[in-house]
Amino acid sequence: MAAAATAPNVDYGIDAPLIARGWFGRAGWSLGGGLLFWFMNRQEYPGPSARVLGALALVALVCAGIAWWKIRSSREGKLELREQLLDQLALRGDEKVLDVGCGRGLLAIGAAKRLKTGKVTGIDVWNPQDLSGNSAEAARENAKAEGVADRVRFDAGDARKLVYPDSFFDAVISSNALHTLDDDHERERALREMLRVLKPGGRVVIFDTAETGHYAEVLRECGAQDVTLSAWTFLWCRPSRSIAARK
């Protein structure tokens, strides 16, 4: 499915903003350094200084390209990804859905748009290093702007210690969240919690970086059925894919 239209005043943030800014910084320093070297040596060493400038300009171009792709992934790519992930849940419209690591509400709001009588809960610790402008208030403002504030709520919560009862949700979804936990043990705890609160027969869909193969193993060990891995994608310039499973 193509990316669903969003309200003009909705902002789902830039993922890992310091990293994107760092790549822009590398581009600037590389180009600036090359120009300075060329300017200081252009008369005495015209050929070598020009070659150094060309090499550093190429480095700057690559760094700027990486930064651009990270921004593009955050502004457009993740909207397309959202619809692909939600399609895998095959929502009827009456489900209770949990979004783990909801950020500014991208997946939670997308799921709420597909519901009629169902409800979505998004949880996060809202770390600003993970997403620009990351806060519960920003998520609520986005939900209001998208017209789904009555179908979605946002709670402060730890993915490793979910406060919800067993078999409470019909579907669980998460994107770019679990890799921010400290280590494999912590990620395993979060995966087990996600399955615990999922109803039998419910579906879980997780998108993340290269840890996904391990996620699939943990889900199978916990008894999940129909565990499938998608093809790799390179949004945000890093190999990522989704895992879908049924409890």
Task: Tell me what each language-model feature is.
Residues R104-K116:
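Conserved SAM-binding loop of SAM-dependent methyltransferases across substrates and taxa
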Residues R187-P200:
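A short glycine-rich, Lys/Arg-flanked "PGG" loop and its adjoining helix->strand segment in the class I
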Residues V148-A159:
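Conserved SAM-binding strand-loop segment of SAM-dependent methyltransferases
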Residues L115, L181-D182, L198-P200:
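Helix-to-beta-strand junctions that scaffold the AdoMet/dcAdoMet cofactor pocket
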Residues G93-G103, T121:
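Conserved class I S-adenosyl-L-methionine
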Residues G201-D208:
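Conserved beta-strand signature within the Rossmann-like core of class I S-adenosyl-L-methionine
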Residues R92, R160-V172:
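A short acidic, Gly/Pro-enriched loop at the edge of an enzyme's catalytic core
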Residues C222-G223, V227-K247:
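Core SAM-dependent methyltransferase catalytic element
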